[in-house]
């Protein structure tokens, strides 16, 4: 009996040893393989020399086509290499809101290469940095639509790439429908020729006011001709295109009224502004003409009032350039008060031309206040100072023995 028990025990030991020779090693690999990945560099090196089977199981090859984003450094290097942008130009492109938003999730270099192959110039990338943020697939569709217009240069129509594909398709259809109506083939080139402005500048403004390209051609043509006939500056026409939404008759009437009032610069806003504003503007122009009289400019008028030559009067105004923007009616009122009522000399006015820009009401109030304290300022400087500086001067004057010589007027 004892012998049979010993034999059974030996058999069990042999069976257990046979089963545990390899499974223990495999289970250890399965349970603790995540810790083996943290092995030291020396162990990794040695394992590489022993065999590459284990390393190949964990290696994932790099695929460039899986990378969709563009690092800032890569984008900057690509821009420098292709266009030789200056640092200021690169900063303008990178700081653009759309570019900054998209460069991490989209390959902007691919879009840039596509646009470059289509002929988009260096200047267009600087003027419209958002071009880099366009979706490449939609960009191909947009380029096909623009090419159907037979343009002379893609850069003439770059601003329209910002439109959605359906909106651009509608716009291109409207422009192509007028091909035979004008020798210029479309309105962009028509406006460019009429105003003598580069097509790319025309597109820059028209892309923000698309109604110009879709409104009835007859109405558009007449309004444009009215602007030209009344010598409205081309750039002012492009900057304020809302005037084209009014009927040609009303546009002509408003421009004629401005011309009769002898406005030195007729602006498109005069067509669309409310009637009271137009009347006030025309009245101011007539008042200025009345003040100028025989003189053709504010410089000549100031020279006459102060008794200086025209060149001397211009030098006086140049000391404080803001004087050039002051209406001659205000200059007259200020000079009448300073020279006739306050009894300042022409030289005192010439030394401080800033007084011509200062509020006449404030000037009078300060003069009356100083006069009540027995102070007659030796110059006009203190009258133009800030409220805090003026109050400091006044308190300093009052605290002394009312001696003007003992008070510094700055």
From Swiss-Prot:
The keyword Transcription applies. One of its GO terms (molecular function) is DNA binding. It is found in: Mitochondrion. Pfam families: mTERF. It comes from the Eukaryota. Residues 1-44 form a transit peptide. Disruption phenotype: RNAi-mediated knockdown is lethal. Most mutants fail to develop past the L3 larval stage, and the few pupal escapers do not develop to the late pupal stages. Mitochondrial DNA (mtDNA) copy number fails to increase during larval development and instead steadily decreases. Increase in broken mTDNA replication intermediates. Coiled coil: none annotated. Belongs to the mTERF family. This is Transcription termination factor, mitochondrial. It comes from Drosophila melanogaster (Fruit fly).
